[in-house]
């Protein structure tokens, strides 16, 4: 579990757009598990799941219809897709909402559905771009706890982009970004020590000159 920490406009969403090929670049190269994104995008992208900052669920479809559509994009057989969908919905405590229209769900529930959707094809890496933005504290904590648990249970690598420092726990790895550049990276204790501050909040404020 690694936190990509930066203010709004720091470049977090741009980085995710480059990784997912929403943006193309003529310079540099991105590799995912050794696979070149430009030369072999299918192999590179098949191992990642993404939860974008902007909601991407179809509000007029049911939860199941949304997830079945996503599974079809990955070429999954219907029987396997149904099994995985039920499993992921059960893990996030929303199995009973399977046939419910997405429009009727709360913001926190929709976010959890998007996380479930991102895991159906069993990725090795999960990218989340400000997944708790606009949610109440209870929903934020539920989502954060679930994703951190996925790291342990599924051995899943997670890159969690946020501007909320209180989502970082001691011992976690952090990459601090500002204006498209990496200012610091390492575990919380190391970053605090190198910047001669009392905590990660002070270190962050010092680095981005708040």
Give residue spans per PLM region.
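Conserved catalytic motifs of ABC-family nucleotide-binding domains
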Residues: 122
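Conserved ABC ATPase signature
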Residues: 101-105
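Conserved ABC ATPase "signature" region
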Residues: 68, 72, 79-97
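Conserved ABC transporter NBD signature motif
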Residues: 28-39, 44
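ABC ATPase "signature
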Residues: 185-186
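Catalytic Walker B motif of ABC-type/P-loop ATPase nucleotide-binding domains
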Residues: 126-129
């Amino acid at each position: 579990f690694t936190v990509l920490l930066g203010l709004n406009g720091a470049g977090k969403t741009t980085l995710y757009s480059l990784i997912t090929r929403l943006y193309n670049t003529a310079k540099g190269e991105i590799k995912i598990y050794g696979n070149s994104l430009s030369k072999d995008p299918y192999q590179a992208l098949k191992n990642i799941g993404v939860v974008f900052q902007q909601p991407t669920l179809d509000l007029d479809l049911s939860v199941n219809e949304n997830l079945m559509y996503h599974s079809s994009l990955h070429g999954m057989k219907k029987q396997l897709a149904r099994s995985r969908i039920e499993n992921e919905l059960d893990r996030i405590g929303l199995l009973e909402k399977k046939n419910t229209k997405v429009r009727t769900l709360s913001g926190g529930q929709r976010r959890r559905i998007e996380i479930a959707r991102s895991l159906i094809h069993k990725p090795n890496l999960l990218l989340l771009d400000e997944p708790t933005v606009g949610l109440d504290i209870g929903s934020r904590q539920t989502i954060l706890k679930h994703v951190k648990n996925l790291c342990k249970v599924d051995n899943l690598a997670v890159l969690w982009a946020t501007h909320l420092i209180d989502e970082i726990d001691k011992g976690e790895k952090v990459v601090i970004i500002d204006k498209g550049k990496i200012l610091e990276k390492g575990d919380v204790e190391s970053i605090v020590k190198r910047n001669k501050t009392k905590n990660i909040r002070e270190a962050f404020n010092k680095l981005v000159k708040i």
